[in-house]
Amino acid sequence: MQVYGCCELVRELYAQIGSGDQGYIPQAISCAVKALNDIAADESLPKETREKAAFAAANLLISDFED
């Protein structure tokens, strides 16, 4: 996926990280899994949203890509 296929908020943060205005996290996969896990665990969110986050986190965890 390219950055231009992402929502405006993602594109804004991407630009800020690229310019040095926002911090870069070298262990991006771990950061993503933690964020997705937080979303999946948040019972105030719709079940469909939580399931999408859980599915994405599980796929990242099972992939052979490591930080």
From Swiss-Prot:
Signal peptide: none
Lineage top rank: taxon: Bacteria
Protein family (similarity comment): Belongs to the UPF0253 family.
Pfam family, one: UPF0253
HAMAP family xref list: UPF0253 (MF_01064)
The protein's name in its UniProt record: UPF0253 protein VV2574
